[in-house]
């Protein structure tokens, strides 16, 4: 029998593979399960392998294959989203607000326009969520590409090293790794072609943290 965290991770991997065909990164899995470190993800992956639910594909980075799912898959999906129930769309997906585009490069004007994006229920944990379309290439080394859709859990707090939606001077939004340096905030890209950005903490507002990603082909 799987633990709750093992169930949650298995379904997160399964739904990511079903939607995009790409395994989530360890960072994405850590954020989705709200764990403090990637070591916890490594332990969960190992446990799922040992129980015959997943296997690693040799000679391929970030390559996981789901071999089987637990019989109580439906019940677990209900538990994952029990604290937040947005309006449902067809085909077992949930619609969340799509707030325009977010810069993965230089900051751009924040959160213009709104429509909706349909996502699998297992992408969403507790709390309110929204989606943004990525513009730019500054986060490519984190597996986030121009045109991707990111799933964001709405929060005004950020932990060290998380990927966040940061609002600069209440006008420009950007997607970056979050770091504190005393009274300053450093926003790091995941592309060596871009330099880190540093601001006084009073100029930065956290709009949410990354919990998932969708890619359309």
From Swiss-Prot:
It catalyses: Hydrolysis of Ala-|-Gly bond in repressor LexA. The record marks 104-105 as: Cleavage. It is an enzyme of class 3 (hydrolase). GO terms for molecular function: DNA binding; serine-type endopeptidase activity. Gene3D superfamilies: Umud Fragment, subunit A, Winged helix-like DNA-binding domain superfamily/Winged helix DNA-binding domain. Residues 26-46 bind DNA. Its EC number is 3.4.21.88. GO terms for biological process: DNA repair; DNA replication; negative regulation of DNA-templated transcription; proteolysis; SOS response. Transmembrane segments: none annotated. The active site is at residues 138, 176. InterPro entries: LexA, LexA-like, LexA/Signal_pep-like_sf, LexA_DNA-bd_dom, LexA_repressor, Peptidase_S24_LexA, Peptidase_S24_S26A/B/C, WH-like_DNA-bd_sf. Keywords: Autocatalytic cleavage, DNA damage, DNA repair, DNA replication, DNA-binding, Hydrolase, Repressor, SOS response, Transcription, Transcription regulation. Belongs to the peptidase S24 family. Homodimer. Represses a number of genes involved in the response to DNA damage (SOS response), including recA and lexA. In the presence of single-stranded DNA, RecA interacts with LexA causing an autocatalytic cleavage which disrupts the DNA-binding part of LexA, leading to derepression of the SOS regulon and eventually DNA repair. HAMAP family: LexA (MF_00015). This is LexA repressor. It comes from Zymomonas mobilis subsp. mobilis (strain ATCC 31821 / ZM4 / CP4). The gene is lexA.
């Amino acid at each position: 029998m799987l633990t709750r965290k093992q169930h949650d991770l298995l379904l997160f991997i399964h739904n990511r593979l079903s939607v995009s065909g790409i395994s989530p990164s360890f960072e994405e899995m850590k954020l989705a399960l709200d764990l403090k470190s990637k070591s916890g993800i490594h332990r969960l992956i190992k446990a799922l392998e040992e129980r015959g639910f997943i296997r690693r594909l040799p000679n391929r980075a970030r390559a996981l294959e789901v071999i089987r799912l637990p019989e109580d898959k439906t019940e677990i999906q209900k538990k994952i989203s029990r604290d937040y129930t947005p309006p449902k769309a067809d085909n077992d997906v949930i619609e969340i607000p799509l707030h325009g585009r977010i810069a993965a490069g230089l900051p751009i004007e924040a959160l213009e326009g709104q429509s909706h994006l349909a996502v699998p229920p297992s992408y969403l944990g507790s709390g309110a969520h929204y989606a943004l379309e990525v513009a730019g290439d500054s986060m490519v080394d984190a597996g986030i590409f121009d045109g991707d859709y990111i799933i964001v859990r709405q929060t005004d707090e950020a932990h060290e090293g998380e990927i966040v939606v940061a609002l600069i001077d209440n006008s420009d939004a950007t997607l970056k790794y979050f770091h504190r340096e005393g009274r300053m905030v450093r926003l790091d890209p995941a592309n060596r072609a871009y330099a880190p950005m540093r601001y006084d903490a009073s100029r930065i507002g956290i709009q949410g943290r990354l919990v998932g990603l969708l890619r359309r082909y």
